Amino acid sequence: MSSGGLLLLLGLLTLWEGLTPVSSKDRPEFCELPADSGSCKGNFQAFYYHPVHRTCLEFIYGGCEGNANNFKTIDECKRTCAA
């Protein structure tokens, strides 16, 4: 195979890896944590991964504390936790 073909194959494999969903064995442990609004009284839209439903759901984040299962966008939640 030519070096150009190898580079193309490597590029396609890299793209495939980036688009492949996270498997449960590769999912960070914090994705299993419940939604936690924290102790502050803000009203911010956030998203968390719900392990039973295996999807990302919206919740209201108070603005401080909480836990790591807290994402600003649903896409960020899906990239990190969704299988």
UniProtKB/Swiss-Prot annotation:
Annotated site (Reactive bond for trypsin): 41-42
Highest taxon above the source species: Eukaryota
Keyword DNA-binding listed: no
GO molecular function: serine-type endopeptidase inhibitor activity
Record keywords: Disulfide bond, Protease inhibitor, Secreted, Serine protease inhibitor, Signal
Domain BPTI/Kunitz inhibitor positions: 31-81
Subcellular location(s) per record: Secreted
Name of the protein this chain belongs to: Blackelin-5
UniProt keyword annotation of RNA-binding present: no
Gene Ontology CC entries for this record: extracellular space
Pfam families: Kunitz_BPTI (PF00014)
Disulfide bond residue pairs: 31-81, 40-64, 56-77
UniProt xrefs under InterPro entries: Kunitz_BPTI (IPR002223), Kunitz_BPTI_sf (IPR036880), Prtase_inh_Kunz-CS (IPR020901), TFPI/VKTCI-like (IPR050098)
Primary location group: secreted
